[in-house]
A protein has these predicted regions:
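Mid/C-terminal beta-alpha module of Rossmann-like enzyme folds, strongest
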Residues: 87-141, 183
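Active-site helix of classical SDR
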Residues: 16
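NAD(P)-dependent short-chain dehydrogenase/reductase
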Residues: 22-76, 83
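Non-catalytic, hydrophobic alpha-helical segments
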Residues: 77, 81, 95, 107, ...
């Protein structure tokens, strides 16, 4: 639940986010704190752009299959944030696109599947093999990552906000926008 106070950040980054949330909540009476996960959008780096770049340059990829979550498209998120700002339904919220949770491996497979459907055959299974591995098999990363990044969005619905579209739809819209550009 978004209002749960049983926090356990895994790293310094998570700790700093929590301290920021607490500073806002302890200072203001009216605030929105919106927690998101697996964010992708037009600007900056993200997992999708990384997989597309790696997929162009390698014929074999290994991707973790034991970390799960749900993607969040910044375009969809921005529309919701406008709706929230125009309301007085303050508090903590969890937001991701709808469509259920997936692993990073499943997400990669769907990225490539949709890219092929949009005419980019360089991402088909004849050109790229994607192999699932555990986090332990993949090796060390820069920071500890949660195995379960699912967020409970029930408060968002109870407050009357419209849920974000399905993540597969969001991915399709995003890929349509970026695939013919250099990223």
């Amino acid at each position: 639940q978004p209002d749960c106070k049983n926090y356990r950040p895994l790293n310094i980054y998570g700790q700093s986010k929590l301290l920021g949330e607490q500073a806002v909540a302890n200072t203001l009476d009216k605030y929105f704190i919106v927690r998101i996960a697996w964010v992708f959008g037009r600007n900056g780096k993200n997992f999708i752009k990384t997989m597309l770049t790696v997929g162009k340059n390698h014929d074999k990829l290994t991707v973790v299959n034991d970390q799960i979550g749900t993607p969040t498209y910044t375009f969809d998120l921005a529309r919701l944030l406008i709706d929230m700002a125009e309301s007085e339904k303050y508090g903590y919220y969890h937001v991701t696109n709808e469509g259920g949770y997936i692993s990073w491996y499943d997400f990669t497979k769907e990225i490539f599947r949709q890219a092929v459907a949009l005419g980019h055959t360089e991402y088909d299974e004849d050109h790229i093999t994607v192999t699932p591995v555990t986090t332990a098999e993949y090796g060390a990363s820069k920071a500890a990552r949660p195995f379960n990044s699912r967020l409970d969005k029930s408060k968002l619905i109870q407050a009357g906000f419209t849920p974000l579209p399905d993540w597969k739809d969001a991915l399709q819209r995003y890929l349509t926008e970026i695939l013919n550009e250099e990223f």
